[in-house]
Design a protein with these regions (language model features):
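Single, functionally critical "micro-switch" positions that shape active/binding sites
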Residues: 29, 86, 181
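Anionic group-transfer/hydrolysis microenvironments
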Residues: 21, 32, 74, 103, ...
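A structural preference for short, pocket-lining loop segments at secondary-structure junctions
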Residues: 1-44, 51-70, 92-96
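Single conserved hydrophobic/aromatic residue that forms the stacking wall/gate
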Residues: 179-186
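Conserved catalytic cores of soluble enzyme domains
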Residues: 46-50, 54, 58-178
Length: 186
């Protein structure tokens, strides 16, 4: 919703840790919210909402300060797109992560496609074959593939090798004080 996006955009003027105290990080955009606009034929509002989400993700990606995401539970769709813009991720071992929009006939719109392609282009296979990365990303996103743990998420490039994996949710904030964030986030 707009309130969440406003809070994220405004918070990028300082080091930021994105965490949700509930069991789920984010299952993505509330589709009922956007369907209400569609049912009324108000497609301008949908366009405005998507553009605002894209701008929010861009603020996270290009913040002058470290942005750390601490996902747990469901981290899907727009939730993944928020996480993937972060400089660093400290993921709980109980995570379900992925871009699942295609399962409901949508295309990820918050930068997830771009970030996935960038991660896959950085592989040895992609350096040998220019078709490798786009086909791999198309397969993952097109089928709405999810990973159900950090162990599964890393080879799918949902998580990077440098991202932390944490078993105890109470450890998230202990890992990163603002001083530690400046030292650990590149």
């Amino acid at each position: 919703d707009y309130d969440s996006m406003d809070a994220l955009k405004k918070a990028t003027d300082k080091p930021l840790i994105i965490i949700n105290e509930s069991m789920q990080f984010s299952a993505g955009v509330n589709l009922t919210y956007t369907m209400d606009f569609a049912n009324k034929g108000d497609f301008k509002s949908i366009e405005k909402f998507i553009k605002y989400f894209q701008e929010t993700c861009k603020h996270l990606k290009y913040s002058e300060h470290p942005v750390i995401s601490a996902p747990s539970g469901l981290t899907l769709g727009g939730g993944f797109e928020v996480m993937v813009q972060s400089n660093f991720v400290a993921s709980h071992t109980n995570i379900v992560v992925g871009l699942v929009e295609t399962i409901v006939g949508l295309i990820p719109a918050g930068g997830g496609c771009k970030e996935m392609l960038a991660r896959w282009l950085d592989t040895e296979e992609a350096k040998k074959d220019p078709n490798y990365a786009p086909l791999k990303v198309f397969d993952i996103i097109g089928y709405g593939k999810t990973a159900t743990s950090p162990v599964e998420a890393e080879p799918m490039k949902y998580l990077r090798p440098s991202d932390k994996k944490i078993m105890n949710r109470n450890s998230f904030c202990l890992l990163y004080t603002s001083d530690a964030a400046d030292d650990r986030v590149s």
